[in-house]
Structure formats: C-alpha cells, structure tokens
C-alpha cells in the first residue's frame, strides 16, 4: 500500500511495487518480484540519490517525524545522515532506499508468499548483489528515475553501490562507498559460515520450513548468528570501553540461552548481557532464512568477477568516487579501501579515500555521523573537490609511500 506523508520540510513515499517477472542471476524466475522502498524529498529530474542499506537494514533510512518505520525498525538506521538540512539533504535531493530481494522488510524473500500460497522458505531463488542492483534499477525505472546524481552505500551496501558502477556505469554521476570493500576476506567468510551454521543447526530451523503461527522459529540459532555479527562490528577498544570485565545482574536475560553447569559459579558479564540483548531483539525483527540468503550474497560478491582486475571492472565508470574507511574497522579495513582507491586511480576515475580516525569498529559509519556526514555531504554536493573531503594520495595520484594508518587488528581472537 502506497503512503505519502508531507510535513514541513519533509515529503516521504513508502510503497511496495510489483515490478513483474524477474530473472535472477541463478537463472530462476520469480513471476512477480515485489520491491519495497522509501523515498524522501522532491524529484526534479536530476537530483536522485540512491542509498543502499547494510546487511540487515531496511528501506527506512530516514526519520518520518512520527518515526513509524517498517516492522522492528521504528528508528531510522541513518537518520542522522539523511533528512532536511543533513548531509544527504532531502530539501535538495530525492533520496531513495530500496529493500533488497531476499530480505524481509517488504521486498520478496524467503518469508514471502509463494505461488502455492505458502512462504517460499528455502525454495526462494538464491540472490546475489547483482540481483539487488538489477531490482533497484527496475524499481527506479518504475519511479521515472533515470541517471542518478549519486549512489551511496555502507558496509555490504557499499558493495551494492560498487556494483552499480559495473552494471550501470552510465547511470551514476557520483559513487560513495562507506566502510566497505571489493570483497570479503577469508576471516570474515569464515565467521559468516559459522553464523549460518548456528542457524541451520537449530532444530527449529527445520530445513527452512518454520513459518506459521503454530511453529517454533529458530530464534536461538539466529541469535547466535547476530552475536557473532556484533563481535565483528565492534573494535577491541570500543568493547573494552563499553564492557571491560564488569559483571552484570542476570535478571531475565541471563537465562536467554542454555547455561553450562558451572555458569552459576562464574559471573555473568556485561558483554554477555549486551550480546544476549542484541540476540533477543534481532530475533524479534528478522527472518532466519533471510539472514542465510543475504550473508551468502555478501560472501559471494567479488568486484573483479568476470574481469581481469578490480580496475578493469571499474573502467567503464566515468563519474567520481568517494571511499570512506575507519581506522578501527577490521571488518572492512582502511587497507582494503586504499586498494580499491588504487583501482579507481588506475582507470583515471577521480577518487578520494577519506580515512576517519575512530575506535568504534565497523559500527563507526552508523554511530559517528559527525565524522561521516561532512565528507559525504560535501562529496555528493561538490564531488572529490568538496571542502571536507580528504584523500590518502597527497598528489592526486598514487598514495604517499609514507602514509601510515592507525593499527587495525586483523583478528578478533588475537586481541
């Protein structure tokens, strides 16, 4: 159902669009792919900005004033960045965010109704980042949006943004990739694999067939997967600052997961309480099968797939690019962004790699808007010449050999 809200300084569209038959990269065809989106501001024909959400995010990127968003995400996930007078100023830009296929916030996915009237479950076609991009392109066609002023993405949304430069290079003027990379490294692939195993090992997963009011859902497995995710998103320093070794009162949450026999003797620590809380909240709002599908899509993405190199994949893109990385992010490191910047430079794409000093880990792109907003907003407005945009390459070419980043811990378990 389409909804349009207009308040002073705000115009918000929220809708689910049936874009018709859609062939996935796997070759499987969905007869009626439904795509959910939200859009903010007024479209003037040349001011459209597409924001690509993170792994378990949704189309609810900005606040509505009333803050009534999609299920379980009443709070906008980037509300400090998108909105009137903010970095992505909806007084100037028509900002669109699309829930990707395979997710569970209105776009078709495993929890959606299939042709037989039952949820698809694991019969839903496998999805890739390329599928996300093509679905977004079709949704934008439906909205009458052609060339995009900018595509912006954070985390796996940054991979989605990069894919726009490969699949639709003529449709993007400016590309902003925040806390992302050209591909996952083997450590992150391994952690994602364990997270999926946690879900599929839960007896309630039942091969992906757990839908229905009278069915138990694999909340324990999904919760464990989310806990692994949160350990990836935080840095050693931020965890030490937030939790240290402090004990917490067990209350109800201390019994959220089965305890080992000696648990009563040892303290229930604040870090455990935090992880248990995040697990409980996540299981209330997200679908376990969607988590399996979306992590597979992220793991599978490789910018250079089908090309000789990352640079070759980006060669057709003639716009400008901003890469934002964070010194405390070991999920997507500054080194990975610098490598990506080098790929852009090798094909003469104007690029700036803006490094943010932060110890907040991967979450920095969400929790430090005061550091992300200025370079992002200036880039979208003015390109790489934007006032707040900095670059690791001191002369606009190859990076200075003396350039040194703050240390990034490569392993969660060695810190």
From Swiss-Prot:
Active site: 155, 329, 362
Gene Ontology MF terms: homoserine O-acetyltransferase activity
The keyword Transferase is annotated on this UniProt entry: yes
Predominant subcellular localization, coarse grouping: cytoplasm
Pathway info: Amino-acid biosynthesis; L-methionine biosynthesis via de novo pathway; O-acetyl-L-homoserine from L-homoserine: step 1/1
Single GO cellular component term: cytoplasm
Residues binding substrate: 226, 363
Keyword Transferase: yes
One GO-annotated biological process of the protein: methionine biosynthetic process
Class in the EC hierarchy, top level: transferase
Region (Disordered): 387-415
Keywords: Acyltransferase, Amino-acid biosynthesis, Cytoplasm, Methionine biosynthesis, Transferase
EC number: 2.3.1.31
Location in the cell: Cytoplasm
Annotated ranges, domain AB hydrolase-1: 47-369
Reactions accelerated catalytically: L-homoserine + acetyl-CoA = O-acetyl-L-homoserine + CoA
NCBIfam families: homoserO_Ac_trn (TIGR01392), PRK00175.1 (NF001209)
Assembly and interaction partners: Homodimer.
Function recorded in the entry: Transfers an acetyl group from acetyl-CoA to L-homoserine, forming acetyl-L-homoserine.
Family named by the database record: Belongs to the AB hydrolase superfamily. MetX family.
The name this protein goes by in its record: Homoserine O-acetyltransferase
Lineage: Archaea, Methanobacteriati, Methanobacteriota, Stenosarchaea group, Halobacteria
């Amino acid at each position: 159902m389409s909804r349009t809200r207009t308040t002073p300084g705000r115009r918000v569209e929220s809708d689910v669009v049936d874009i018709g038959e859609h062939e996935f990269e796997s070759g499987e065809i969905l007869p009626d792919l439904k795509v959910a989106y939200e859009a903010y501001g007024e479209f003037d024909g040349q001011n459209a900005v597409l924001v690509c959400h993170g792994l378990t995010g949704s189309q609810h990127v900005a606040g509505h004033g009333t803050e009534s968003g999609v299920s379980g995400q009443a709070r906008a996930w980037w509300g400090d960045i998108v909105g009137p007078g903010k970095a992505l100023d909806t007084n100037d830009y028509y900002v669109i965010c699309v829930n990707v296929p395979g997710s569970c916030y209105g776009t078709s996915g495993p929890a959606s109704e299939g042709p037989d009237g039952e949820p698809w479950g694991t019969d839903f076609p496998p999805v890739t980042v390329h599928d996300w991009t093509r679905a977004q392109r079709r949704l934008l066609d439906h909205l009458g949006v052609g060339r995009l002023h900018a595509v912006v993405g954070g985390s796996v949304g940054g991979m989605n943004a990069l894919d726009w430069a490969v699949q639709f290079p003529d449709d993007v003027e400016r590309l902003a990739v925040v806390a992302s990379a050209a591909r996952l490294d083997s450590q992150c692939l391994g952690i994602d694999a364990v997270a999926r195993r946690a879900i599929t090992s839960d007896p309630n997963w039942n091969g992906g067939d757990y839908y229905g009011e009278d069915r138990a859902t694999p909340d324990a497995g999904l919760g464990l997967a989310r806990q692994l995710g949160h350990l990836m998103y935080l840095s050693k320093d931020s965890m030490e600052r937030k939790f240290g070794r402090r004990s917490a009162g067990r209350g109800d949450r201390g019994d959220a997961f089965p305890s080992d026999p000696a648990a009563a003797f040892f303290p229930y620590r604040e870090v455990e309480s935090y992880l248990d809380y995040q697990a409980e909240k996540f299981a209330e709002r997200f679908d376990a099968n969607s988590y399996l599908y979306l992590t597979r899509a992220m793991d599978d993405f490789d910018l250079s797939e089908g090309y000789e190199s990352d640079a070759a994949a980006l060669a057709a893109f003639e716009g400008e690019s901003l890469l934002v990385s964070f010194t405390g992010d070991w999920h997507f490191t500054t080194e990975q962004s610098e490598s990506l910047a080098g790929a852009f430079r090798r094909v003469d794409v104007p690029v700036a790699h803006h490094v943010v000093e932060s110890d907040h880990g991967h979450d920095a792109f969400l929790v430090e808007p005061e550091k992300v907003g200025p370079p992002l907003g200036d880039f979208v407005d003015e390109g790489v010449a934007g006032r707040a945009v900095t670059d690791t390459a001191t002369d606009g070419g190859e990076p200075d050999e003396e350039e040194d980043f703050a240390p990034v811990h490569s392993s969660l378990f060695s810190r």
